[in-house]
Amino acid sequence: MAFKPLHDRVLVKRVQSEEKTKGGLIIPDTAKEKPAEGEVVAVGAGARKDSGELIAPAVAVGDRILFGKWSGTEVTLDGVEMLIMKESDIMGIIS
């Protein structure tokens, strides 16, 4: 299913966290927190200034990003859990 976010919204796929610690301990599902890191899958056209001028998004498809723990709305598209969030919820791009 194709999905195109509107305005300054971004579709993000969470990056899976490691199931083992560096010391080799396996982390059970009940103890895992959802990662606050993801990959941008789709980007809207951008926000608009009061004058109506379009502000281009700072992120692009494929960017790896860091976002707040409670950011976005969870959705399932084609059986994959994703997040839709405003661009302002993104803290930065990981390079």
UniProtKB/Swiss-Prot annotation:
Q: Which UniProt keywords apply?
A: Chaperone, Cytoplasm
Subcellular localization is given as: Cytoplasm
SMART domains the record matches: Cpn10
User: Where is it predominantly found?
Assistant: cytoplasm
Which GO-annotated molecular functions does the record name?
Answer: ATP binding; metal ion binding; protein folding chaperone; protein-folding chaperone binding; unfolded protein binding
Any Gene Ontology CC annotation: cytoplasm
Biological process terms from the Gene Ontology for this record are:
chaperone cofactor-dependent protein refolding
Q: Which Pfam families match?
A: Cpn10
Q: What's this protein's family per the entry?
A: Belongs to the GroES chaperonin family.
- What is known about what this protein does? Together with the chaperonin GroEL, plays an essential role in assisting protein folding. The GroEL-GroES system forms a nano-cage that allows encapsulation of the non-native substrate proteins and provides a physical environment optimized to promote and accelerate protein folding. GroES binds to the apical surface of the GroEL ring, thereby capping the opening of the GroEL channel.
For this protein, the record's NCBIfam families field holds: PRK00364.1-2 (NF001527), PRK00364.1-5 (NF001529), PRK00364.2-2 (NF001531), PRK00364.2-4 (NF001533)
Q: How does it assemble?
A: Heptamer of 7 subunits arranged in a ring. Interacts with the chaperonin GroEL.
Q: What is this protein's record name?
A: Co-chaperonin GroES
Instruction: State the organism named in the record.
Output: Rhodobacter capsulatus (Rhodopseudomonas capsulata)
